[in-house]
């Protein structure tokens, strides 16, 4: 506090004390004594103590200088006048003012949270009732909706469950009857592919060592040799049949395996052609007609 009085008193006393601490301490107490005390203190601390004492009060206190200071304590004397407390207005208006003229215990403070705050256009029903959520979006005839009848029941081939896609005659559908039942050799389950007479039956293709090209001359060399053997067998069989009973010539042996399916088909066709050509009616057991086969 300011302790007006303080002055003189204390003097003598305080002395030394304050010092130690130097600074006003001692005073600590009285500090107040407004008087010079404390102040100066820091400085000369107590020093002067004893001395000057009184001075302290001298208020002016040279204290500044140190001396006296301590004394300053003036022991408190400087008392805090109750009147000072009486001067402070404890009315709510003084200490509970929120700066807006409203007191903390004033109902006006809560009136600021007016219902209008939660009743503005931000929560207007129109916000969620606009055209973005229009039924026409989900029920239109465009093909850009995932559940549009026009998409699933149309005749386009771009729908995975379109009847026109699965039942068409194109060969681009994995379950198309035309693909699985055709006569092409490009289907894995085609009867013509698996049940043909290409040269891998009866051991013709790889029996008797014919299937392995020990001479390492390549697939075509092997194929030529296999066809030549088949042609020779066909001619021999036809000749024997013609001499004995003039019956039809035996069918030519199948071409050896190897080479493409198409090459095998050609080889088979030529072998049969050779067999048919070499057969003939024997005349009195005469030799049947012979026809040389040109190698592939």
Swiss-Prot record:
Residues 80-96, 103-194 have a biased composition (Acidic residues). Residues 233-243, 270-281 have a biased composition (Low complexity). Residues 1-77, 198-210, 244-259 have a biased composition (Gly residues). It is found in: Secreted. Residues 1-219, 233-296 are annotated as: Disordered. Component of the acid-soluble and acid-insoluble organic matrix of calcified shell layers (at protein level). Keywords: Secreted. One of its GO terms (cellular component) is extracellular region. This is Aspartate and glycine-rich protein. It comes from Haliotis asinina.
């Amino acid at each position: 506090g300011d302790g007006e009085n303080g002055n003189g008193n204390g003097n003598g006393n305080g002395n030394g004390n304050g010092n130690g601490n130097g600074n006003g301490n001692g005073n600590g107490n009285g500090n107040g004594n407004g008087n010079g005390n404390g102040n100066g203190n820091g400085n000369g601390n107590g020093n002067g103590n004893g001395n000057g004492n009184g001075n302290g009060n001298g208020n002016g206190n040279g204290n500044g200088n140190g001396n006296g200071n301590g004394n300053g304590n003036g022991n408190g004397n400087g008392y805090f006048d109750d009147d000072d407390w009486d001067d402070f207005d404890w009315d709510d208006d003084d200490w509970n003012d929120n700066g807006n003229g409203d007191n903390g215990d004033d109902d006006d403070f809560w009136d600021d949270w007016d219902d209008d705050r939660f009743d503005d256009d931000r929560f207007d029903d129109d916000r969620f009732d606009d055209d973005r959520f229009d039924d026409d979006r989900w029920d239109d005839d465009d093909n850009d909706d995932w559940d549009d009848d026009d998409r699933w029941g149309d005749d386009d081939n771009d729908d995975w469950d379109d009847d026109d896609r699965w039942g068409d005659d194109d060969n681009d559908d994995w379950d198309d009857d035309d693909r699985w039942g055709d006569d092409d050799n490009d289907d894995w389950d085609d009867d013509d592919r698996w049940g043909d007479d290409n040269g891998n039956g009866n051991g013709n293709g790889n029996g008797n060592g014919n299937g392995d090209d020990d001479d390492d001359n390549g697939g075509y060399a092997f194929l030529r040799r296999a066809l030549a053997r088949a042609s020779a067998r066909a001619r021999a069989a036809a000749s024997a049949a013609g001499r004995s009973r003039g019956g039809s010539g035996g069918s030519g042996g199948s071409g050896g395996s190897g080479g493409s399916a198409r090459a095998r088909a050609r080889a088979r066709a030529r072998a049969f052609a050779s067999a048919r050509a070499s057969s003939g009616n024997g005349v009195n057991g005469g030799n049947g007609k012979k026809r040389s086969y040109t190698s592939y």
